[in-house]
Design a protein with these regions (language model features):
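Short amphipathic alpha-helical segments and helix-helix/interface helices
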Residues: 1, 51, 104-108, 131-132, ...
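Generic alpha-helical structural context detector
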Residues: 1-9, 16, 84, 91, ...
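Phosphate-binding beta-alpha-beta segment of Rossmann-like dinucleotide-binding domains, i.e.
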Residues: 1-37, 49-52
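Rossmann-like dinucleotide/phosphate-binding beta-alpha-beta segment
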Residues: 26-113
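Rossmann-like dinucleotide-binding domain for NAD(H)/NADP(H)
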Residues: 114, 124-217
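Glycine-rich nucleotide-phosphate-binding loops and adjacent flexible coil segments
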Residues: 118
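Active-site beta-alpha turn of Rossmann-fold NAD(P)-dependent dehydrogenases/reductases
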Residues: 121
Length: 217
């Protein structure tokens, strides 16, 4: 949600301006979330949390998931309907053969003009070239990416003194309505403590032939 609000309200640009004592607000106008349509693809734990946050902003929330959760207070619709109605689209699904490039030339064409897209899940959910084409066509109001499908060897590294060989990533950084961060959505003190704790618990369980938590069959 922080990324969506930043992209929508240009907070990062406002901060850069005020650091230089430029208090001009031209070009920083955003849009209200109230009563807008939020679309959530993937309703696992993180998707569910995002739905609750959207409801807090009094948004109309639509969801798509091949395995709907009947206990969740949200309206499930087809992917096509969600894409065609969402003013703000947030991706929260795992990367599988079925979800790879779920955002592509075809699905982008279904989206509303001026829609906002945020991906904090997996980079491979988005066809980067299709995204660039959509940005060039001014399809999006804004795009927030905490993940990128070719992030290996780039994200978590200091490449500030290097020539970036990834033309698509370099192109994405040129768009004024695109915000990219380096896969840091998980990076909080509490999350890192939880990861360490669960890793040690699983190591102990494996050593002692106990049941592993979150075992992937």
């Amino acid at each position: 949600m922080a990324m969506l609000l930043t992209v929508n309200r240009f907070t990062h640009k406002a901060y850069g301006r005020t650091r230089e004592f430029n208090m001009n607000i031209n070009g920083l106008m955003g849009t209200d979330l109230y009563h807008k349509v939020a679309g959530v693809i993937g309703t696992g734990k993180i998707g569910q949390a995002m739905i609750r946050i959207f409801h807090g902003f009094r948004m109309n929330v639509l969801a798509y998931d091949p395995y709907p959760n009947s206990n969740l207070d949200v309206q499930y619709v087809s992917l096509e309907e969600l894409l065609s109605k969402a003013d703000f689209l947030s991706l929260h699904c795992p990367l599988t053969p079925d979800t790879h490039h779920i955002i592509n030339e075809k699905t982008i064409s279904i989206m509303k003009d001026g829609a906002y897209l945020v991906n904090t899940s997996r980079g491979g959910l988005i066809d980067t070239q299709a995204l660039i084409n959509g940005l060039l066509a001014k399809k999006f109001g804004g795009v927030g990416l905490d993940v990128y499908e070719e992030e290996e060897g780039l994200f978590y590294e200091d490449c500030s003194d290097e020539i970036i060989q990834d033309d698509n990533l370099a192109r994405l950084t040129t768009f004024p309505n695109v915000l990219i961060t380096s896969h840091m959505g998980f990076f909080t003190v509490e999350a890192m403590q939880s990861i360490a704790h669960e890793t040690l618990e699983n190591a102990y369980a494996l050593e002692n032939n106990l049941t592993l938590k979150n075992l992937v069959e």
